[in-house]
UniProtKB/Swiss-Prot annotation:
Pathway: Pyrimidine metabolism; UMP biosynthesis via de novo pathway; (S)-dihydroorotate from bicarbonate: step 2/3. HAMAP family: Asp_carb_tr. Heterooligomer of catalytic and regulatory chains. It comes from Thermococcus onnurineus (strain NA1). SUPFAM superfamilies: Aspartate/ornithine carbamoyltransferase (SSF53671). Keywords: Pyrimidine biosynthesis, Transferase. GO terms for molecular function: amino acid binding; aspartate carbamoyltransferase activity. Belongs to the aspartate/ornithine carbamoyltransferase superfamily. ATCase family. It holds the Pfam family OTCace_N. This is Aspartate carbamoyltransferase catalytic subunit. One of its GO terms (biological process) is 'de novo' UMP biosynthetic process. It comes from the Archaea. L-aspartate binds at residues 86, 168, 229. Carbamoyl phosphate binds at residues 57-58, 107, 135, 138, 268-269. The lineage of its organism: Archaea, Methanobacteriati, Methanobacteriota, Thermococci, Thermococcales.
Amino acid sequence: MEWKGRDVISVRDFSKEDIEFVLKIAERLEERLNKKGHLEYARGKILATLFFEPSTRTRLSFESAMHRLGGSVIGFSSAASTSVKKGESLADTIKTVEQYSDVIVIRHPMEGAARLAAEVAEIPVINAGDGSNQHPTQTLLDLYTIKRAFGRIDGLRIGLLGDLKYGRTVHSLAEALAFYDVELYLISPELLRMPKHIVEELREKGVKVHETTDLEGTVPELDVLYVTRIQRERFPDEQEYLKVKGSYQVNCAVLKNAKESLKIMHPLPRVDEIHPEVDRTPHALYFRQVFSGVPVRMALLGLTLGVLEG
């Protein structure tokens, strides 16, 4: 597989071999970072970060990743300060920005925006989230986090909790987990169940899938509990949001019958779905998960720029 110039738009564009290759490169980069703190693979290269939606971790970890590779960063964190406010099209914005950069990272509220950007641009485009559709780099760092914690992904029982209808992180993650020998527990309110087509695809690929509303009854079965925020901004109807707001909270009482080895993950930001008391337990893995974004995104940037090899 030729990585130089490759777009990263959807988990569906990856094979299991692709995923394992990225995780291997990320692990190697993390080891080198721990020794040196700063690398020079991308010296002279420029990353453009185009964030049409709010972001803390994704934007900053991409910027950190590029700086740690020795490259530079330009971009914006809000469309309000760009010519989009004057009516400029997404295509024209992309064609303009690629004149200044070597790789583009884009987050946009419209599903399919990253794919459109990739079709227009002649430089690599990396999807940092397009509406409620896909978030492939989050998925890769999630898999990396799990593998670093357990030494494997195969054989694990993994629960996805919360907004499974609109949550792009769980859509991408579920699709990627289908490459592995895992058992999935989909825990959500009835109104926020995983889209039917994703569940059907998982089962067609041989994944054992359980759908439930019962968090406490499911926790003892799990090796990983992946918690998501119920995303108010994704709901077309405020009343629909109010019906499911605060449906679940992971706290020490909920975890009383959990395996000692259970790890809790969250793509963040959290609101109240994980109580802060959980932060002090051995179960909490979400801040290590945040760190994983740096080596994984370093790997993706380096590979697509052609400055890293296997």
